[in-house]
């Protein structure tokens, strides 16, 4: 049986630095990393969009268009380059007319962009419809992102007065759930029908639990014919576990960062995903030696961002999964808690 391969989208140069370091990574620091990225073999690299254009112009006095062109030239087509778009709001904060959308997407693709991840924070399909259509028309890859969220907790009822009122009072009915698995599947199917070539479950707040990641990803895989991507953050502490559950349930692409830009309020580190995939018999479709070279240089890049690094005094120790050994108790725990191949079918 052929070993399963998991494709990766590297977020380090966009979402990683935005989540941890206020999007202040300079072009000079990025230029030092690009020769190593060329050989890493990431399926997709997210390098643009989100807060990048605003921050690059506002705080670094640099051109976001230059950044896209420089990265595209350096990568030589070896990884697809992606950006994050707020649908009708593009990279801004107000809705734009169709003429602006089309002109912007045309220039983005002409300057080296391949994949546009398109989302609306309220999952309003009308706000992503034209973006998906235009990206496809212009020769790009439309990545439809379904935003994950949870139902609000019902307010506690007012305390009833008196012993018998509290004893015999009826319990208020639970409100009907809105954000069910079926809700996310239907939003994904709508985007697929519009022409999205990738569907992402986008958990930008890190709210999706491991069990919920498993149930939603398995249903997306059963109901879609396009690749499924999983995006989460480690803010509450279980982003890594949720990512592993997404892997176990057949996700095609996983979003990760490289060590010094991973974890915390960012996406999980690829190095830890690699450890779990080794235990599970799943191959990462990436050159981990090249990833190690990027990691070595990323530490200097992180040090250059000390003014924006809330954890500069308590950074994790370096970890090279190709050379370092996990502590025996941790390694045994991973071995005995990893599902068997039979469990993964």
Residue ranges with predicted function:
Residues 61-65, 121-138, 181, 206-220, ...:
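Active-site-adjacent beta->alpha loops and helix N-cap segments on the catalytic face
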Residues 336-345:
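Conserved small/polar residues in nucleotide/adenosyl-binding loops
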